[in-house]
Amino acid sequence: VQGGKYFSCSAEFNQYTEDRVKELIPLAPLHNGAHLVAFHAFKNALPNVGNVAVFDTAFHQTMEPEDYLYPIPYEYYEKYAVRRYGAHGTSHKYLSVTAKEKYLKDKEHYNIITLHLGSGASLAAIKDGKCIATTMGLTPLGGVMMGTRTGDMDPSVMEFLCTQTGKSVQEIYNEFNFKSGLLGISGISNDTRDIEEGYYKGEER
């Protein structure tokens, strides 16, 4: 999922790629680690077959600085590469290419807004086949509300909850990733089918 600043396209899964994917686990805690496990499983099962890493962040590397930089001290971008990376790029690229082929064949210039809707969700603005803006940010936690993830909110919520509950930043961060979103709001499920069923049963939340 997360290729950070290192990958703007797919890459052979060699030692360099593995090291970068591992380095970027904090930016995609639900995904990068699991993908490394899968990579090693394939490598052990099929040692003579090559592996390629396809990064969900790669498609969004065409964004301009004014669209991916955060309004925080610039040194954090320079030192730690803190910026908007986006996600679901493979999906957004497929949607934009398919829409162009089906509906915009004769258009040299075109604008498309794509939506990736699942337990994780994001939107992207695409101009002439290139991403110019997307909703997810540094990690897949940002953007619109999702199945178990918060999406965007006031950054001070983290500090406030740590102070009020005595929980660590990591504990609250895990709750933002695994216990929030539709699940957190509804108290029922992250699955819209369960939430709809709850609605018809009179569950107000």
Predicted regions located by residue number:
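Glycine-rich phosphate-binding loop of actin/hexokinase-like ATP-binding domains
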Residues: T62-C162
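A gly/proline- and charged-residue-enriched helix-loop-helix capping module
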Residues: R20-A38, Y80-V82, G89-K93
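Short beta-strand-loop/turn "lid" adjacent to the catalytic site in phosphate-handling enzymes
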Residues: V1-H31, G50-V52, A58-D67
